[in-house]
Amino acid sequence: MKKLVYMVVDTETATLPFANEIANNDPELKKKIAIARPLVYDIGWTLMYRDGTVFEKKQFLITETFSVPSVFNTAYYASKRPLYLAMMERSEIECLPWAKVMEVFVADLAKCDFVGAFNSMFDFKKAIPFTELYIQKLYSPTYYEWEEMQYRICENIVSAPYQKKEKDFDPDHFSFRDTDYDLFDVWGLACDRLLNKKGYKEMCFEGSMLTNSGDYFKTSAETAYRYLREQYDFEEAHTALADAEIESFILSKILAKGKIDLGIDYFPFQKLGHPMDYVRTMKPSKKRERYADVIYQKMYDYCGLSEDEPPIPTKYMERTMEKMEILKDWMGI
């Protein structure tokens, strides 16, 4: 019987070269552009069997993005450039045109039964398709007209209030160059099968691993790997192949629990519930006080209450302040 083959992909991305200008160097506004218009500069993937055996791995830098300072300098991890140059010096990675890299990528896709990433929505529905479009336009005579249109779109991204737009979307497949590939999402599967447990949640409390708002438990590849490996100081490399390798390990733990479901799971972190609800069910104890304090500190910082100037009140802040009063009661303050 043929062994099933799984491809796990990770990308590191920059964005369009005028992002900083449009965002006026505001990191949050730039982040909105970077999420909506990602350009891959580092791509890595593994091929593995369901027992976790990785039998092939690849990693490439992309010439049209990594080697163009105005693009690469928009990357969140632009400071890693010397690391990549050292890797190239040691022949650990090649920098090739997108077309060449995609030839290798498509050839490996043909070997696979399933393809996925930790955040398949980002990698397969945004980063790879938008980079494919960008490269097509870059080598076309209409690039400047397209760039001008993208500039206007990015202006709208940072200025217009968020509106959910309904559009055709296939969560079960990665469509690329006229072929559909069965798609899984490691993040959603991990939240469903590995992380929605008391041990994981208590690790998050003990390590203050909640989202910045304090409303949810962190469910990143990094925190999942810490839990599964019991390596609580582990930090992701944030280079494509290294991250794909830890995501492959997480997938192996998921596969050990049975057949995977296809598709992208929207907001999978919500499956773990709210940290406040977890603390609410605890009996009064020092541990309960400690966990309540972890949530309180997250909310305090997120609302900007530690800043010299008090923030402008919002409805969200008012609701958060109400939660903080409840937390203070649980903390015995």
Model-derived features: positions:
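Conserved DEDDh/DEDDy metal-dependent 3′-5′ exonuclease domain
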Residues: 78-198
